[in-house]
Amino acid sequence: MACSMRVLGIDPGSIVTGYGIIEDCRDKLTHVTSGAISLSRITSFPQRLREIYERLTSIISSYSPECAAIEEVFFAKNVRSAILLSHARGVAILAAENARLPLHEYSPLEVKQSLVGYGRASKDQIEKMTKRLLNISQIKSLDASDALAVAICHLHTARTKERMGIAP
């Protein structure tokens, strides 16, 4: 079966970064792999950033996605948390860029609307729809589920643009 696109979805975090790779095979979404890069809070922040970068680089090398999709930073009440998240997001973007992967960015609202049709969907609703769309019974973590959701959002967006004759 010919697959048209393999996408790496990334849900960045300074303690846990989710990742998920899916393929679009003849308009059927297929789960390739997913998981979470879990880091110790007692490890220094620069070491955690290096670990995120190295693990994502290894995943990219092992699974050869054609592009990456990452969630944008959402509005955060805690400025420090938003800054830490932005650093983690930056090293994830660097891993994709160093692998020469086209990178697509989506807001949490866009991801939720793409999967559930409602921009204020709960994490549980996102996980249930992700499992349904990928025809899998279990996802290792909510972070992996969120990363898979970002990848699905990108494939839905790419399909729509293709059907409309708009370059992705």
Indicate residue ranges for each PLM-predicted region.
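Phosphate- and other anionic-substrate recognition elements at nucleic-acid/protein interfaces
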Residues: 1-168
